[in-house]
Amino acid sequence: TLLPTVALPDPADGPLDPAAIMPGAKQVWLEIGFGGGEHLAGQAARHPDTLMIGCEPFLNGVGSALRHIEEGGLKNVRIHADDARAVLAALPDASVDHVLILFPDPWPKARHAKRRLVQADVVSEMARILKVDGKLRFVTDWKAYADWALARFLETPGLVWMAEAADDWRNAPADHIRTRYEDKRLGDTEPVFLLFERRAAPAA
């Protein structure tokens, strides 16, 4: 099986060192909840010098991603087949260039909102691991989750929304890779693209 060769070191064993995981990597990207892995593998193929870390707790998605990795002969992907929070906690400060969250489980009912990935403490960890000028990308097709997530991101020190016009949320980034999930249109709105940048703390 391919999984042992592409498995991320277990974050329970201690801090993760991206430079040791892929020596010489020019960038580090983290995709949280990669689903079937089309986006993860597609970006890895485009950026062979980038360490692509993917987190996905569902084994069907992991199996699909492994097929994409094998078919593409990709050497720059590492997978954590479990909850992403442990990976966030184990990554060093300012060690990641890109955090990507594409179509996470929406938990659309208000009483389930606390089950969503995007919570204040988790977003603070994302901000901590991002390098200055690093990017965070969040995409959902559920309006309530888009509103919820935008509020969580905006209240997080160090994250700045990159929107320049009122309808920027409609526009996919130039490097966006569509997935089967996106094409199914399961949500209640068109895809909402929220892009943020990590800024340095102001000098005291």
Mark where each language-model region is.
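A short glycine-rich, Lys/Arg-flanked "PGG" loop and its adjoining helix->strand segment in the class I
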Residues: V118-V132
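A short SAM/SAH-binding and catalytic strip from SAM-dependent methyltransferases
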Residues: D97-R116
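S-adenosyl-L-methionine
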Residues: T1-L30, E38-H47
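SAM cofactor-binding core of SAM-dependent methyltransferases
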Residues: Q27-A86
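Class I S-adenosyl-L-methionine
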Residues: Y145, A151-A204
